[in-house]
């Protein structure tokens, strides 16, 4: 069993924001498998898919980003998924828009959702798929207002190309493992 978690903020006002790109990737995965999210046994929405004879739980925490660890730990306990079966999908302000980076483990790198998951698990030993959101054309003055802001039209065009690649990268992790997916997807997309 694999658990793929997309990070974001639950309220409708955050839909389409840069910080919710993890939710966007999970929504694309669910649509690909023609399934819908329902209320889980914890503070999350989940759905189950099967891909190449592998069971996968897709999960969207319904906590705010900075408290994502509670939902992740609850789901890991309920579904009996170990760290090796966990993949977190989140935005990354340190990566330029149009790029993704898969890692087998590592620090939070300034991403507060990852930071809380690491705190709750007491470990950095889980896979993550980081989706770049840093603008190429302007400096940032306020990180929080930027990540909570909606994508510009130009950024949306880039994300429409990136999100399907993220979907395929996540499925590659499920089937072939994180190392294989890193070799295939850790390169610029745009």
UniProtKB/Swiss-Prot annotation:
Site (Discriminates between blocked and unblocked aminoacyl-tRNA): 9
Site positions for Stabilizes the basic form of H active site to accept a proton: 91
A Pfam entry, by short name: Pept_tRNA_hydro
Keywords associated with the record: Cytoplasm, Hydrolase, RNA-binding, tRNA-binding
GO terms under biological process: protein quality control for misfolded or incompletely synthesized proteins; rescue of stalled ribosome
CDD domains: PTH
The EC number(s) this enzyme carries: 3.1.1.29
Catalysed reactions, semicolon-separated: an N-acyl-L-alpha-aminoacyl-tRNA + H2O = an N-acyl-L-amino acid + a tRNA + H(+)
Transmembrane segments: none
Primary location class: cytoplasm
Subunit structure: Monomer.
Protein name per the record: Peptidyl-tRNA hydrolase
Gene: pth
């Amino acid at each position: 069993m694999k658990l793929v978690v997309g990070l974001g903020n639950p309220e409708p006002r955050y839909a389409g924001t840069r910080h919710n790109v993890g939710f966007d990737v999970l929504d694309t995965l669910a649509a690909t498998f023609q399934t819908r999210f329902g209320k889980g046994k914890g503070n999350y929405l989940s759905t189950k898919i099967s891909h190449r004879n592998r069971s996968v739980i897709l999960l969207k925490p319904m906590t705010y980003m900075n408290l994502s660890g509670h939902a992740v730990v609850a789901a890991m306990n309920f579904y009996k998924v170990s760290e090796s079966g966990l993949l977190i999908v989140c935005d990354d302000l340190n990566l330029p828009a149009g790029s993704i980076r898969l890692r087998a483990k590592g620090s939070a790198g300034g991403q507060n959702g990852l930071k809380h998951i690491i705190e709750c698990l007491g470990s950095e030993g889980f896979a993550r798929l980081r989706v770049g959101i840093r603008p190429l054309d302007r400096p940032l003055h306020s990180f929080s207002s930027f990540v909570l802001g909606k994508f510009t039209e130009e950024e949306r065009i880039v994300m429409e190309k990136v999100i399907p690649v993220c979907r395929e990268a996540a499925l590659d992790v499920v089937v072939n493992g994180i190392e294989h997916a890193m070799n295939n997807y850790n390169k610029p997309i745009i």
